[in-house]
Amino acid sequence: MTTPSFEQGPIRPPSEAQSLLVRVIRNCTWNRCSFCPVYKGQRASQRALPEILADLDAMAAAADVLGGVGGSSRDMLRALQDGSVPPVAHQVALFLRGGGRHVFLQDADPCAVRPDKLVAVMQRLRERFPTIDRVTTYGRASTVARRRSEDLRSLAEAGLTRLHLGLESGSDEVLRAVCKGATAEQLVVAGRKALAAGLELCFYVMPGLGGREQSAEHVCGTAEVLRAVAPAAPTERPLVVRLRTTAVAPGTPLTERVAGGAFTLLDDVETAAELRALLDAVGDVPFELRSDHALN
């Protein structure tokens, strides 16, 4: 069993640890955020649909060899150890041990892919893995904001369940400072469009992204975006906000700002105080707050 075209992207949310990882686009279409080291030096490109479908077929074949959902752990381990299955099977094994229910589409902005192409991918997913009940992906706010509402609805109808959007900050000043390539208005539009299409929405917020210099603006702007988007979420599927505390990765432009004295990292106490201020500013607007990353 050979899989010459098989690819897997470098990252996924912690909540997708046992998800089937399907790479539909390589790297990041923006790739300029000053805090992110992940795709630096890598060019973004879209994968051809036949390549993606071949990956799905290969993963389904590996799942059959491993015994499928509910297969014997002993037999699965033996197959992985004796080399009778290809490297793709290691990732498939995690998916199966998690119940074979969740899929994550990679890399940073699959929403930049044509909607009909994504629909074709999800159709093949459902054919090959009928136990799937959740398909999620990352998306850039600027991309989602430009998408037609009917395109987002077609993705939801085809099986896309949840959109992970990098809010980071709701302050235009902070967003410009970190070269995010999105505005607060685009974040609001993207969030509301996703919810109106029937998608679950997860926003990522980065405590400390404004540094000491712009902490107040960061809190105020982020609270405004959350207050504008959260009420649009249905009660049974509230907006989820996941925290990703700002860290300085070597080789990023943010490192240079810190070294030059233009950006001062918050300490732990200041970070906690900023988060408290954010929650106070959001008020009684309903949303779920989750802290599920080692950076926190």
Which functions belong to the PLM regions below?
Residues 1-21:
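Short, charged low-complexity linear segments at domain edges
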Residues 14-75:
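Canonical Radical SAM [4Fe-4S] cluster-binding loop centered on the CxxxCxxC motif
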Residues 28, 36, 52, 105, ...:
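Conserved, mostly hydrophobic/aromatic
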Residues 44-47, 51, 113, 117, ...:
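Alpha-helix N-cap and loop-to-helix initiation/capping positions
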Residues 61-196, 284:
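Conserved SAM/AdoMet-binding glycine-rich loop
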Residues 162, 185-254, 268-292:
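Conserved C-terminal portion of the radical SAM core fold
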Residues 253-262:
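Short, glycine-/aromatic-enriched active-site segment of Class I SAM-dependent methyltransferases
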Residues 294-296:
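Conserved catalytic loop of SAM-dependent methyltransferase domains
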